[in-house]
Amino acid sequence: LYESDPTDEVIAMGADVIVSVNASPYNKGKIKLRCDMVAHRAKLQKKPIVFVNLVGGNDGIIFDGASLIADEEGDIILQAAAFEEFVETVELDVRKPDARGITGGEIAAIHQALVLGIRDYAAKNGFKKAVLGLSGGIDSTLVAALACEAMGPENLLCVMMPSPFSSEGSIKDSEELVRNLGCESRIEPISATFEVLLNQMNLHKPTKGGESLAA
């Protein structure tokens, strides 16, 4: 599947089917790119290619699975579901309609990748619960929603930490979010701690950049 591809060598040795066992990590657009590459190579070599890919999260790397088979005409005759284990029996000599694109859209794939990555990171590192800060903004809201989906709302504690820079709306938004998600929450104000930090560092109360210092 690359410039230094070994398919010529195995075909010269008499191979009827090429099986490519991979740990190909996910990134945006990778599933379609992989399909196109496998289909092109199968048609070029006039041999079926079975592309078997690892699925699961490993620290910061996510493997999407999405294994596939291209026949000698370059048609994708099997496209496994992405981000989940998949077992299938396939007859290579039976013509089937092209299955390309069965894994769904790119936004859905990114969503599945994030959920799988969080779930496997927690499981493989031996923890079942998580604590995260909730500001009421878009970033922490998205993280909380993904964590609830990956680990279950009963395993998530959201901590709201109002500071001198927090608005009343951000707290209300955070409280509404945890009600909708069904997870546990706590409010731990940090205004007093922030003042202590300013005094210890002999800083005047900042204007610009104060939010970052509070964080």
Protein language model regions, located:
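Conserved acidic
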Residues: I102-I110, S166, G209-G210, A214
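Alpha-helix boundary/capping detector
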Residues: S140, C148, L203-H204
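Conserved G/P- and acidic residue-centered "switch" motifs that form tight phosphate/ATP-binding loops
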Residues: G137
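Generic "edge-of-domain/loop-turn" microfeature
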Residues: P97, F165-S166
